[in-house]
UniProtKB/Swiss-Prot annotation:
Entries under InterPro entries matching the protein: Na/ntran_symport, Na/ntran_symport_serotonin_N, SNS_sf
Gene of this entry: Slc6a4
Topological relation to the membrane, as annotated: Multi-pass membrane protein
Domain of life: Eukaryota
Signal peptide positions on this chain: none
Extracellular domain ranges by topology: 113-115, 187-252, 298-324, 381-421, 484-494, 559-574
Source organism: Rattus norvegicus
Gene Ontology terms for molecular function: actin filament binding; antiporter activity; cocaine binding; identical protein binding; integrin binding; monoamine transmembrane transporter activity; monoatomic cation channel activity; neurotransmitter transmembrane transporter activity
Broad class of where this protein is predominantly found: membrane
Name of the protein in question: Sodium-dependent serotonin transporter
Binding site for serotonin: 98, 439, 494-495, 556, 559
């Protein structure tokens, strides 16, 4: 008897008309023909509903059927899956909870009405952020592909979205890990009996350095600077050696060594796939919560802590009448949860087919939002302490935003606490682990996408491809390691990646809800989970979530941020440069649409129909289909 060798690369299975194919335990969903799409009985994207058969027939229960003869390729062996369910949850939480939760949310909250800001933030999370988060998890888990090849199974004409996501991920890796390098430099500098940013007697200090904690009756002038500020600006960043974007200065060898060390850790954490990264996140995703708990208890016991808490949460309801508050709430929840970056697609693609991604979406979203909220207490109890020590209002202490809030204000507060070295070490180690989680996720999104799209080239060479990606990211980070690197980091964050990712997410939401079809998408979810998403989710996916993204994009275009950093005003040409960098990723979408229409044979109408019709089947493990649909 002839048998198929276990190491064979593929098995060809021919599907007859109006049938789904079952081969080697895998259910193949076929692709409809152009004629079938025109039939009024067809549901979205041309799939026709197949009536349920008897309970004994496990091969098909309300599964959309193929309406054409199809030769489908089935690869031997199953896709890699997470070792444990908790590996996946910790990876998603580690990705969503990043540095922005620690510095951005508390600052935006108090700037936009304190406790009143929680209302628009919650509304935007419920109607915008969480539905998009759930959509990506469901898409990735059902189709089991990265952000490039998944579009062959959804709507091929939008495959450029995947390429755009990969380019954006590279830009983010180029500047985000530089911030982690700053934290690592601080961590190494903290391994002393006395923290170096506590005095004005170091080689990098200037005559304006004033340590108001050292003695009483210190006169603070407009030109006075704190030891922590000079350590950050003149020693770590060496910003005084740069005149701006037009003259970035030399590359810091100290920061270069830090970023090489960081990417070395990243490489050995993700080179073997989710089996290894899923174990690493047990440390990197849980350690920040231990440190946050310690810092929260310590901050609450400091004198003046209550002043900071009141300043953080005191509601200003009049702020809700300002459009900017709602824009900030929408942007914060979107960038915090992180749909549109391809990461959720990649992570979910390694889940088991019947994993409850609906529950996962709710749990991880709530954990992320609560972490942001609690981080505000960690930050503002310390700011209240700083205000008490300076005999100033909390608003005067909380003027720093972004990384400066952590590397200047919070670092200075830690330096003047008892056991300052201990708290400095755990604080900066927490920042590093927060950043590493997000980098693991961002690069895994790219790696999964490329390996799924080019399996014959890279499937058995993952370690080498990961090495290429890591080296490319290190080289891309060189500009941010210069004396003026902080200027580059801010430009990339505000203009090169933010608007681009919003645009990509908007097109993705429209492509899934309007082209692939909300009916078909909900049918897919029902096959996995045994129940169909309710009307709330359908309305959000079809209308509210796209409008949510469009609202942020339009607000950004009408009122783009005026960049200013460390008394440096960005020139107009730099803003144009930022937009151009952002467009270099988004341009992949219309470029691929044009390429697809040109390369597809037939009339224009036939080309369009073929280009929006799924071209490859979705493999569904038959034993994993839920039959208890309600």
């Amino acid at each position: 008897m002839e048998t198929t060798p276990l190491n064979s690369q593929k098995v060809l299975s021919e599907c007859k008309d109006r049938e789904d194919c079952q081969e080697n335990g895998v259910l193949q969903k076929g692709v409809p023909t152009t004629a079938d799409r025109a039939e009024p009985s067809q549901i979205s994207n041309g799939y026709s509903a197949v009536p349920s058969t008897s309970a004994g027939d496990e091969a098909s229960h309300s599964i959309p059927a193929a309406t054409t003869t199809l030769v489908a390729e089935i690869r031997q062996g199953e896709r890699e899956t997470w070792g444990k369910k908790m590996d996946f949850l910790l990876s998603v939480i580690g990705y969503a909870v990043d540095l922005g939760n620690i510095w951005r949310f508390p600052y935006i909250c108090y700037q936009n009405g304190g406790g009143a800001f929680l209302l628009p933030y919650t509304i935007m999370a419920i109607f915008g952020g969480i539905p998009l988060f759930y959509m990506e998890l469901a898409l990735g888990q059902y189709h089991r592909n990265g952000c490039i090849s998944i579009w062959r199974k959804i709507c091929p004409i939008f495959k450029g979205i995947g390429y755009a996501i990969c380019i954006i991920a590279f830009y983010i890796a180029s500047y985000y890990n530089t911030i982690i390098a700053w934290a690592l430099y601080y961590l190494i500098s903290s391994l002393t009996d006395r923290l170096p940013w506590t005095s004005c007697t170091n080689s990098w200090n200037t005559g304006n350095c004033t340590n108001y904690f050292a003695q009483d009756n210190i006169t603070w002038t407009l030109h006075s600077t704190s030891p922590a500020e000079e350590f950050y600006l003149r020693h770590v960043l060496q910003i005084h050696q740069s005149k701006g974007l037009q003259d970035l200065g030399t590359i810091s060898w100290q920061l270069t060594l830090c970023i090489v060390l960081i990417f070395t850790v990243i490489y050995f954490s993700i080179w073997k796939g989710v089996k290894t990264s899923g174990k690493v996140v047990w440390v990197t995703a849980t350690f920040p919560y231990i440190v946050l708990s310690v810092l929260l208890v310590r901050g609450a016991t400091l004198p003046g802590a209550w002043r900071g808490v009141v300043f953080y949460l005191k509601p200003n309801w009049q702020k809700l009448l300002e459009t900017g508050v709602w824009v900030d709430a929408a942007a914060q929840i979107f960038f915090s949860l992180g749909p549109g970056f391809g990461v959720l697609l990649a992570f979910a693609s390694y889940n088991k087919f019947n994993n409850n991604c609906y529950q996962d979406a709710l749990v991880t979203s709530v954990v992320n939002c609560m972490t942001s909220f609690v981080s505000g207490f960690v930050i503002f109890t310390v700011l209240g302490y700083m205000a008490e020590m300076r005999n100033e209002d909390v608003s005067e202490v909380a003027k720093d935003a972004g990384p400066s809030l952590l590397f200047i204000t919070y670092a200075e507060a830690i330096a003047n606490m008892p056991a300052s070295t201990f708290f400095a070490i755990i604080f900066f180690l927490m920042l590093i682990t927060l950043g590493l989680d997000s980098t693991f996720a961002g690069l895994e999104g790219v790696i999964t996408a490329v390996l799924d799209e080019f399996p014959h080239i890279w499937a058995k060479r993952r370690e080498w491809f990961v090495l290429i990606v890591v080296i490319t990211c290190v080289l891309g980070s060189l500009l941010t390691l210069t004396s003026g690197g902080a200027y580059v980091v801010t430009l990339l964050e505000e203009y090169a990646t933010g608007p681009a990712v919003l645009t990509v997410a908007l097109i993705e939401a429209v492509a899934v809800s309007w082209f692939y079809g909300i009916t078909q998408f909900c049918s897919d979810v029902k096959e996995m989970l045994g129940f169909s998403p309710g009307w709330f989710w359908r309305i959000c996916w079809v209308a509210i979530s796209p409008l949510f993204l469009l609202f942020i994009i339009c607000s950004f275009l009408m009122s783009p941020p005026q960049l200013r950093l460390f008394q440096y005003n960005y020139p107009h040409w730099s803003i144009v440069l930022g937009y151009c960098i952002g467009m270099s990723s988004v341009i992949c979408i219309p470029t691929y649409i044009i390429y697809r229409l040109i390369s597809t044979p037939g009339t224009l109408k036939e080309r369009i129909i073929k280009s929006i019709t799924p071209e490859t089947p979705t493999e569904i493990p038959c034993g994993d289909i839920r039959m208890n649909a309600v």
